[in-house]
Amino acid sequence: MIGKLKGVIDSYGEDYVILDVGGVGYQVHCASRTLQALPSPGQAAVLSIETYVREDQIKLFGFRTDHEREWFRLLQTVQGVGARVALAVLGTLSPADLASAIALRDKASVARTPGIGPKVAERIVTELKDKAPSFANVDPTVVHLAGDLDDQRAPRPVRDAISALVNLGYGQPQATAAIAAASRGAGENAETAQLIRLGLKELSK
């Protein structure tokens, strides 16, 4: 199996790069974000590789980091997500953004991926929710609150405060993080207006 390739960029295709390694050109399929980050033809590049062997072909998938490759593998543990869909997700969200979206139950961010419907986005978030926090630098308090919101266990003032921030134009993850921080400072009995005020203060930092 090929685990890493180091060579010179020969050319680019729509969803792949040809990497010249010692005179042999390897066609490596990559996410759009990865392709955009690679250098111009003629320059050196290193890619972590995931090798797929089928009866009729060998296909190489390339990643800038081992961490990105691990996400590629993890995404494919979700029902209905194959290599093509996994690459599309990684083309839309960085590994850090994907981890945060899953940890915060942010289905909308995942659903921005071309070709991903709401049902697949929900499966990704649901099936990977217990694995994502270990990949993400997300405050455990925020993750806990996101879970409470998802299960309708969060107090009404907290839900209303987050909804108010979302209506003001903030994203669901931003609003959840801000109100989680506000809740820690205000205590369990805080009213909606107080949480909104403290949440906006957090967002202005």
Swiss-Prot record:
Residues 1-64 are annotated as: Domain I. GO terms for biological process: DNA recombination; DNA repair. GO terms for molecular function: ATP binding; four-way junction DNA binding; four-way junction helicase activity. Residues 65-143 are annotated as: Domain II. InterPro entries: DNA_helicase_Holl-junc_RuvA_I (IPR013849), Hlx-hairpin-Hlx_DNA-bd_motif (IPR003583), NA-bd_OB-fold (IPR012340), RuvA (IPR000085), RuvA_2-like (IPR010994), RuvA_C (IPR011114), RuvA_C_sf (IPR036267). SMART domains: HhH1. It is found in: Cytoplasm. Residues 144-154 are annotated as: Flexible linker. Pfam families: HHH_5, RuvA_C, RuvA_N. Residues 154-205 are annotated as: Domain III. Keywords: Cytoplasm, DNA damage, DNA recombination, DNA repair, DNA-binding. Its main location: cytoplasm. One of its GO terms (cellular component) is Holliday junction resolvase complex. Has three domains with a flexible linker between the domains II and III and assumes an 'L' shape. Domain III is highly mobile and contacts RuvB. Belongs to the RuvA family. The RuvA-RuvB-RuvC complex processes Holliday junction (HJ) DNA during genetic recombination and DNA repair, while the RuvA-RuvB complex plays an important role in the rescue of blocked DNA replication forks via replication fork reversal (RFR). RuvA specifically binds to HJ cruciform DNA, conferring on it an open structure. The RuvB hexamer acts as an ATP-dependent pump, pulling dsDNA into and through the RuvAB complex. HJ branch migration allows RuvC to scan DNA until it finds its consensus sequence, where it cleaves and resolves the cruciform DNA. Homotetramer. Forms an RuvA(8)-RuvB(12)-Holliday junction (HJ) complex. HJ DNA is sandwiched between 2 RuvA tetramers; dsDNA enters through RuvA and exits via RuvB. An RuvB hexamer assembles on each DNA strand where it exits the tetramer. Each RuvB hexamer is contacted by two RuvA subunits (via domain III) on 2 adjacent RuvB subunits; this complex drives branch migration. In the full resolvosome a probable DNA-RuvA(4)-RuvB(12)-RuvC(2) complex forms which resolves the HJ. This is Holliday junction branch migration complex subunit RuvA. It comes from Nitrobacter winogradskyi (strain ATCC 25391 / DSM 10237 / CIP 104748 / NCIMB 11846 / Nb-255).
